[in-house]
Amino acid sequence: ILNSFYSPIISIDREKKSVDIFINKVNQKVLINGDGILDNWQISINSSVKDQLSSRQDSLLLTGCLTLANIDIKNIIISAENQHCEDAVNLIRTSGTISSLIIKNSLNDGFDADYSTLDVEIVNIMNSGNDCTDLSGGFYTLKLINLYGCVDKGISIGENSQVIIDDTYISETKIAVAVKDSSQVIIQNIDSQNVEICIAMYRKKQEFGPSYGLIKQNMCDSNSINFIQKGSYYDG
């Protein structure tokens, strides 16, 4: 089920399995949810809005310009550009596979996944005003991640998440990878350049505990040493 708010421009081609969304007003958002499976669809969202939203979330508690919630997905492609919401793309309680995720020029976070189980082939995110990737409360496997120009964190992992990453390339970012709040991450290979801190591990919320991080091949060039809060385990 596709729900829109404040009438964004939407074009759906069921034969090609494509959804094209254009946002031209600050409060416009799109929510895709419901029973069934979204199989081999391509979703694209663009925007001409330059202003910040006055509130982080709306009356429906949606933070994404594009939100997928309570839905199964298979081999979908998502692209988002010039988004102004708290999250350009937000997946909530979503399970399945993403073939490609491309996000450019987000005013705040690029990709945010909450309480989901996802297997993602390719992630390309450029120029996010906060975090490029935020993974919370779920199980996530990512094959290839390319991140550039993340004002705060390249990859933020929290709320008891379990994450496996094969290869990630991160540059022009404050913190390459942050692991928080009882989360676990295994990264096969990381290559980071022009970052302030490679790895930060800490507890942000009192109800959680320390975290675990393992990086098998670490080629990270940072300006400062890693921050590993007492109790967390890091091998890299």
Model-inferred region functions:
Residues 1-236:
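Extracellular beta-rich repeat passengers
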